[in-house]
Amino acid sequence: MNCVCRLVLVVLSLWPDTAVAPGPPPGSPRASPDPRAELDSTVLLTRSLLEDTRQLTIQLKDKFPADGDHNLDSLPTLAMSAGALGALQLPSVLTRLRADLLSYLRHVQWLRRAMGSSLKTLEPELGTLQTRLDRLLRRLQLLMSRLALPQLPPDPPAPPLAPPSSTWGGIRAAHAILGGLHLTLDWAVRGLLLLKTRL
């Protein structure tokens, strides 16, 4: 039996190419991800978050009705009007969208801490909203990296948000945050879909 094994090894050594299965050629480049596919994924996440925000806004209005417009000075202003969509450029859109969503993430975190038991019935939904907002921000950062856009410097520490003066003030702040986030996400979906046609 040992003689047979040695004979097999000798024969294989005479044809080394047959002893090892061929592998991929060395140094073969990996296919780079398609930016349009990355943008599609970002749009899907943005649409999903838009729907989450819409549903949560409806729940907030049902549980805590508050007529009229509600503003919060610390919230970002809407990035662009619908009429100016044609002049958008991808780098500026992604940069501004990321900055605005970071602000909204901070406000949602503040709302969950500041309101406590007042918004307890909406806490699961607010927690889900915060998680998905963070996921979209990570997706935007990945998209900017894949498109080789300039890396942004770290954001300076934002001043802490003051606690609401009353429960009613907190409820008005919740309406302002969700309403502003809904408008921002709606604008983002429109802008990203338009910019996809230019890639």
Swiss-Prot record:
- Example GO biological process: positive regulation of cell population proliferation
> Its Gene Ontology molecular function terms?
cytokine activity; growth factor activity
> What is the superkingdom listed in this entry's lineage?
Eukaryota
Signal peptide start and end residues: 1-21
What is the protein's major site of localization? Answer: secreted
What does the UniProt entry say about where the protein is found? Secreted
Does the keyword field hold Cytoplasm? Answer: no
Site (described: Important for interaction with IL6ST and for the stimulation of cell proliferation): 168
Entry keywords, A to Z:
Cytokine, Growth factor, Secreted, Signal
Q: Per the record, GO CC terms?
A: cytoplasm; extracellular space
Residues of the region (Important for interaction with IL11RA and for the stimulation of cell proliferation) are 182-190
> In which family does this protein belong, per the annotation?
Belongs to the IL-6 superfamily.
Task: Provide the assembly information.
Answer: Interacts with IL11RA to associate with IL6ST, giving rise to a multimeric signaling complex.
As for what it does, the entry says:
Cytokine that stimulates the proliferation of hematopoietic stem cells and megakaryocyte progenitor cells and induces megakaryocyte maturation resulting in increased platelet production. Also promotes the proliferation of hepatocytes in response to liver damage. Binding to its receptor formed by IL6ST and IL11RA activates a signaling cascade that promotes cell proliferation. Signaling leads to the activation of intracellular protein kinases and the phosphorylation of STAT3.
What name does the UniProt record give this protein? Interleukin-11
* Organism listed in the record: Macaca fascicularis (Crab-eating macaque)
